[in-house]
Amino acid sequence: ESPLKGEEPDLEDLLGKVVNEKKFECTSDFTKIAGLDAVTLSIQTPFKNKEDLIPDFSALYEGIRNVGRNLRPGMLVVLESTITPGTTAGPASVMLEEESGLVAGIDFALAHAPERVMVGRLIRNIREHDRVVGGIDPVSTARAVELYSPVLTIGKVIPMTATAAEVTKTAENTFRDLQIAAANQLALYCEAMGINFYDVRAGIDSLKGEGITRAMLWPGAGVGGHCLTKDTYHLERGVQQLGNSDLDYPERQPSLFVLARTINDFMPRHMVRLTKDGLDLASISVKGAKIALLGWAFLSNSDDTRNTPSEPYRDAMIAAGATVAVHDPYVDHAPGISLMPSLEETIRGADAVVIFAGHHQYRSLDPCEIKTLTGKKHPVIVDGRNMVDPEAFIANGFIYRGIGRGDKNNHPVRN
């Protein structure tokens, strides 16, 4: 039985093929590294303390040292992990040299080739996305280009230095986080002004032609995952270590990128406010209320729960005295929580139904069926991903609240 969960097209078939052809092997024996031509490392690099820009590189450094102990002349080592700019040519190079007794750039090649994939699109992304590769010297760069070029079917390899590749990866995720924050902030503005964010978004997106586009992303209940929640801090740490003395920036002003992180981290708290507002209108106390939380994964149609924004929301509602039942069709287990076995059991008796994940199963929620399951005259529905038709639920007596839906969030309650 495959251990893969969620929707990952082609991955299971490809794994089965290479296993059957004996081209794929899992092992904990690091001595086998000595028989390889190239080694790639893709190990998580979280932060111990984001405020102090202190990353937890312990797992990555352990992996690097294990490679170094088994390194032989002529090999290529590639770091695929997202790392602070300067790591490949700095600490990684030093550790490999210390453990192997070899010299980076002379006895072995060393490069950075950051992964650029999304859960749910792994194989397609690997084959079709351009691949940034950067070595600590021209020979290392050329070796990395040679390694990755055959994998790409549509994308091309873009060579640069190792540090430039590190900045590219951290900056592309930082910029996406910034784009999401812009959408989230505008959604909050639209709620405050009583207008529909999605009307405004459509108007903004209509400006095209002559190379101009102002396409906006969608707002939502929060940003999760392993990458966007930390890569801003890798970039900030990189500029502090490599170029802080030369950085010309408005004095005593916070980083725009860090501010974007703050906005995105705020969105689960805004979902708490929307929930409490709805419960207040229904004359239901938060203390003792039952909340049906739909979605524990941070990404639509995925089982990836890393840094899920559902968690701070759940914690805040429990701290306020509510009971929270969690459902996710893709997640079998999550530390510290009990997942409900069915959507029906999750919603049964709920005072509020709160949508956190954009799973396709939640797009077909029927207001009549949901209301019957809750048993409430005026149940609350809070839509954090623009999944449902507000009017359909309002017409059935629901109290609706939604991210960016200032046009609906103050609707009169219908009997």
Summary of predicted features, one role per range:
Residues E1-N415:
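Structural/interface elements that position substrates and couple domains in central-metabolism enzymes
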